[in-house]
């Protein structure tokens, strides 16, 4: 059971909340979180780098000069890897970098990473009604009242996000702020942020989605 204080829009403590998420054992926690992080970063690779071998480069079918008698080194093709414009030896080819991780392990890693950041977790009341219109300045001021240091990396987790939502429109222009929905939780964002701000409703949704 984890306890955390709840702050309002003005940054005042207005209550406490508790949540419970099953995490990995202490001796295996860092290992499973590391596996999930490596999987996420590896799966983000496009894997479409491609070079041409001497067989794929256009031209080079004719022997550039006769084998003997010219005084130059023998050559069989102008597309030899030794030549400028020739093929590439052992160059990259399109490949699949995807790593597999069981669903139970992925969820366990997410829960472990989330609970592991409890010291940097800031729980706030729902504040969408506080922004009557998109206003980045007001959201930046609220983050400062909640304890997010300017220029530090912050992760803001909402229960859901709409493109027309005032919170989304206010947050998208803040350089070091990442905005995600509760069902978009991922290990990289949890570990990368200096502070994690989560609304009370998003915290409930996280328990609902990831508790199993």
Swiss-Prot record:
Task: List the biased-composition ranges (Basic residues).
Answer: 60-71
- Entry keyword set: Ribonucleoprotein, Ribosomal protein, RNA-binding, rRNA-binding
Output the Gene Ontology terms for molecular function.
rRNA binding; structural constituent of ribosome
Example of a GO cellular component annotation carried by this entry: ribonucleoprotein complex
Q: Where is this region: Disordered?
A: 45-71
This protein's record includes keyword Aminoacyl-tRNA synthetase: no
Biological process annotations from GO: translation
| Recorded family membership | Belongs to the universal ribosomal protein uL4 family.
The family database entries (NCBIfam families) matched by this protein are listed as: rplD_bact
Q: Function, please?
A: One of the primary rRNA binding proteins, this protein initially binds near the 5'-end of the 23S rRNA. It is important during the early stages of 50S assembly. It makes multiple contacts with different domains of the 23S rRNA in the assembled 50S subunit and ribosome.
> Can you say what this protein is called?
Large ribosomal subunit protein uL4
